[in-house]
Amino acid sequence: MENQHQKFISRRNFIKTSALLGGTAFLGTGLPNIKKTYSKELDYVGNFEYPLAKPENILYSACLQCTVACSIKVKINNGVCMKIDGNPYSAMNLGENLPYDLSPKEAVSIDGKLCPKGQAGIQHAYDPYRLRKVIKRDGPRGSGKWKTIPYDQAIDEIVNGGNIFKDIGENQNVEGLKDIFVLKDPKVAKAMADDVTKIRKKEMTVDEFKAKHKDNLDVLIDPNHPDLGPKNNQFLFQVGRIHNGRIEFTKRFVNDSFGSVNWIEKTTLCGQTSNKAWVHSTREYLEGKWTGGIKSPRPDHRNTEFLLVFGSIVFEANYGPVQETEPITEGLESGRLKIAVVDPRLTKVASKAWKWVPIKPGNDAAFALGMIRWIIENERYDTKFLQNATRLAATNSDEPSYSNATYLVKVEKDGRAAKHLRANEIGIGTEKEFVVISNGKPAAVDPENSNLAIQGELFVDTNLEGIKVKSPLQLIKEEAYSKELAEWAELSGAKQKDIEDISKEFTSHGKKAAVEFYRGAIKHTNGWYNGQALIVLNHLIGNMNWQGGISNTGGGWSYIGDKEGQPYPMANLHPNKLSKFGVPITKEGWKYEESTLFEGYPAKRPWYPFSGNVAQETWPSISDGYPYKIKAALISSHSPMYSLPGGHVQLKTLLDTEKVPLLIASDIVIGDSSQYVDYIFPDLTYLERWATPGQSHHIRVKVNQVRQPVIAPLTENATVFGEEVPISLEALMMSISEKVGLSGFGKDAFGPGKDLNRMEDFYLKLVANIASGNKQGELVKAADSEEMELFKSSHRHLPKTVYDIEKWQQTLTSDEWKRVVYVLNRGGRFASSDDAYEGSFIKKKIPGLARLYLEEIADSRNSISGNYFTGYPKYLPIMDMAENLINDEGEFHLITNKEVFGTQSRTITNYWAQLALQPENFVVLNSVDAKKLKVDNGDKVLVTSTSNPKGEHLIAADESRPTIGKVKIVEGIRPGVVAISTHYGHWGYGARDIQIDGEVVKGEEVRGLGIHPNPLFRLDDNLRGTTLSDPIGGSASYYDTRVNIQRV
């Protein structure tokens, strides 16, 4: 593979255009020249002093080859990134991390752990297909024809609009961003936002709103529906992988400066249902409201004795292999840990397990409810924990948390469990108090009353003052008992004995057992209830906040300045900030019934009150113009055509200039989706930019890694607010702000005398907050003269466009600057791995309750079917949004997965990892199925589905390719299930020929090898090309498709 790649890129003229990195002097005739530089520098012998072991050649940063954002140690020579390892200061990458006060000069010889993707990040940065200049389409959208244009011209065109494509024969007057930025007055925006909230709560009518705001109704999308918000909302920013820091920078632009609600991330393509189910299942009850919650509790792997894994490939993906592999392996090696894995595919961790149960995809709740039945029948639940109804009761019984297992639930006449009973409803307390049965009588419960220690009865089915009530555990018992254990086993595809054995083992380790789950369990239409059932298993043994149980992350020091004494409260440092308001294009965070669009059921499209960042709903909603039209969209680090199930169906929307008149991308390459836009502005890779990502879910101590530029930027420069800076997403947003006149950027952006002219003016303030700590007495040390000199020498290769030390110092006080240097010299701020525990408990606890019943879910409806959701775990078959059963013909059930060396799009450039280890993916079958199909390893097969009966993947207006892949036969997959991994089968990213300024840039065939499974996934027949989705958590379905396979 390496020789093939060298042969390709050694041709001097393979990329002639300077718009791409491979056509510049930096790479010369290609990447082998960099390799020669490596060899020239490192092949010395004798007394040669190894340059990569010198502290002045080391910079610390944060990875972005996957979501985990490992802390990294970047080794540089002559300005070139030569090697990437883990940062030994960080507990993310070294189990017993180095003392934070250890000098970087002493730390230089110690490396932390890093996965193959992280080490291959060099090729992400130095990809010859990287975009350096702004390009504009030179033909119809998706034609593959481009031309370079000056940065300032591109900014002028997207801001001012007009007939900007007349040179290619298009006669369309495009509204520029300045024409969409209509609501400009912060006072008007605030008043309107407040009143839309009143409309939402039914405290104000639309007529009253219109009368009050009669002088400004022209700024609204539709004055008859003020809750759609201002015309500003017709600007969409959709982003994929983005981390803290950059999140706040872009939200500052989209939400606070431009005033659009449409900042949409890609989370429902990832683990959103898991996140939201955990958040609601760990909330606190404060001042009469459920609030807070933790989105991603995980097992304390270092102390767990029994780990039950559902649909999570912990050695290959999740959050992430670097953090999970070591404690799990140590536990297996020492005999401390026993593992069971419930997954249709034999994952790496399943190969080490005591039991592997190849479940039927989508039937995780059936297996979990079988376990719950066995646990209740055999009384193996933690009675003491579940009975504790208040925090004081938990404290008195030496428990760090408590549950709502005993909080009575009202049962409607039709048998539907609704909201919790409140004490005022039966005359024993207030509307903010719950009711339990304690000592045979109803008792009012305020969960946080520090003087109240109450224990409730677990199984209750009674009437109080004429109101039918049941306890949450009673409702769960009834669901679990609705089928015999043998029936649950049959539904799940497991053996009854496996359910019994695993249930017994799970309840044999006290608090030191845990259920871990992720995408495999929740990326289904029934994903919410699957996830909730697995969460309840953890709650039944009361393992929350215990060593070896389910625990919170260690968190970090606040980067946004919301702690007392921190120098930069970023939310308050934005004069003339606009108040965003209105329904997002995805209808997320809103109940259909509270909007003025409510006209009974079904709604025109789904609404997602309990989810956010519903990526798969974005483009179908744009296509339908519901709830309104989008006039301009900016896409960054996101590839909807590649990452969305059925994304190819939405290609027609991207290509339609009537649907989205102005389509812009900020991208490092001409990608699988950015190839269809009007303008592409080059962006920086993670080795050239800033962020403050936050830590992995699996670390129990504070971690604040800081992403900072470690190599010179490889994009062209531009002048923004009088400063020469590299073209990037930040520069693009700042240039738009400068041209349109938005608040929050440029002169006095943070307040009088506090400018935001360069991205460092923003990001260094975040680092200063981290250095300050969360409370008094937590300041990091100030860098001494030796550390200051090291800082200067290690940054010596960076140009002033990204490292102007005088301007860096000017954006902070002298004292803040020295402490920021101390943090940057270590790549962030890190607590010792010894700081994770307090006795038998996790030190940083989940503050809320273990909630077995979610009344807010039970009190809400599916916007399409009109039926109520359920507040406790239940078994549901696979259904569309209208609750029609999906019972497709198709011989095989399709699932997907990741390899440890691959991540969606960006790792296709990694010749050292993905392409060297496995240049293409496979259609993975069990040998039983291969015999039926009469296929062998390497045979090509066509894969088809109900939603794609011809097996065609549309990649252009008039071009498609077949969904054909090579067979790989394994024993480690359930018969009847077929697996196709992601991160292959590209048609952008340098995989095909394109044309720039009349020159053909040849694609590299190896980048397009393999089969992409997403075009095969089942679509919702009622929603015009939208994938099946979970109506509560909002996740797109990746595991509910049946396919047929035919040898070709």
Curated annotation (Swiss-Prot):
Gene: srdA
Name of the protein this chain belongs to: Selenate reductase subunit A
Domain of life of the native organism: Bacteria
InterPro entries named in the record: Asp_de-COase-like_dom_sf, MoPterin_dinucl-bd_dom, Mopterin_OxRdtase, Mopterin_OxRdtase_4Fe-4S_dom, Prok_Mopterin_Oxidored, TAT_signal, TAT_signal_bac_arc
Domain 4Fe-4S Mo/W bis-MGD-type: 56-129
Residues engaged in binding Mo-bis(molybdopterin guanine dinucleotide): 270
GO CC terms, sorted: extracellular region
Traits of the deletion mutant: Disruption of the gene abolishes selenate reduction but does not affect nitrate and arsenate reduction. Selenite reduction is decreased, but not significantly. The mutant cannot grow with selenate as a sole electron acceptor.
One Pfam family it belongs to: Molybdop_Fe4S4
Location(s) in or outside the cell: Secreted
Keywords: 4Fe-4S, Iron, Iron-sulfur, Metal-binding, Molybdenum, Oxidoreductase, Secreted, Signal
Function: Component of the respiratory selenate reductase complex, which catalyzes the reduction of selenate to selenite. SrdA is probably the catalytic subunit that reduces selenate.
GO molecular function terms noted in the UniProt entry: 4 iron, 4 sulfur cluster binding; metal ion binding; molybdopterin cofactor binding; oxidoreductase activity
UniProt: [4Fe-4S] cluster binding residues: 63, 66, 70, 115
Subunit and interaction comment: The complex is composed of three subunits: SrdA, SrdB and SrdC.
Signal peptide: 1-39
